[in-house]
Amino acid sequence: MSATWTLSPEPLPPSTGPPVGAGLDAEQRTVFAFVLCLLVVLVLLMVRCVRILLDPYSRMPASSWTDHKEALERGQFDYALV
């Protein structure tokens, strides 16, 4: 009744998981491309926001704050009803 354990020279059976070289199916590729596009848009928006925060007046057109406006356009309503 002695049990002897010996190692067999046979290789182990392959694992039951997905193969290592398996590609993505069509739905996974579509989702991956969509997420990648969203990340690119997010990075572009972050860069734009940082540039605006660092120099806010360079993005503003000069004509909106340097031209001379009439009194009613500036908000001065003194004697407007006369």
From Swiss-Prot:
A matching Pfam family: Cortexin
InterPro entries: Cortexin
Localization per record: Membrane
Top-rank taxon: Eukaryota
Transmembrane segments: 30-50
GO cellular component: membrane
Membrane topology according to the record: Single-pass membrane protein
Stretches the record annotates as Disordered: 1-21
Keywords, in A-Z order: Membrane, Transmembrane, Transmembrane helix
UniProt family annotation: Belongs to the cortexin family.
Function: May mediate extracellular or intracellular signaling of cortical neurons during forebrain development.
Protein name as annotated: Cortexin-1
Origin organism lineage: Eukaryota, Metazoa, Chordata, Craniata, Vertebrata
